[in-house]
Amino acid sequence: MKSLKYIVSAGILAFAFSCQKNKPSIPKISGLWKLESMKVRDTTKNIWSDYKGGMHGYLLYDGNGHVALHLYEKGYEKAGIEFPNFNDSIPLEALKHITKSYYYMGNYKVSEADSIVSHFKLSHSNPSEFGLTAERRFYFSGDTLVMQPVERKNSRLKLKWLKAK
């Protein structure tokens, strides 16, 4: 009789654990990343150099399928230029400065099999890129996330990201 109680108890426990919802795993790519380097390859000499003299930026994957990216030229935040937001009468110098910053937000999907993350852009600093998709081949080298654009026009770029603390 005791063994029957143990068998029934074990069966109930096994059933209870099997009925729990499996939480989807959060991709390793999730989190806030700080740009360590953005390089461009000269295909004639096969030499890598800093893109636009050096870039800074952040990349956020929230674990719920949302992505945010902001890239900007080195020194962008220290230019000493001030202008009001949502105003169409800012100086030409400020307008030119804004073009040194690139950002978008959207949704993302990771294909582990292909090592590609797709960014579906919901908003963008460039109106012509609203609704477009960017694909990035990625891999990890230690604690560094390394990405290369799949699309031909940006395929000479390589971005290295470190997890922000």
Regions found by a protein language model. Give the residues of each.
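Lipid interaction determinants
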Residues: 19-165
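Bacterial Sec-dependent N-terminal signal peptides
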Residues: 1-29
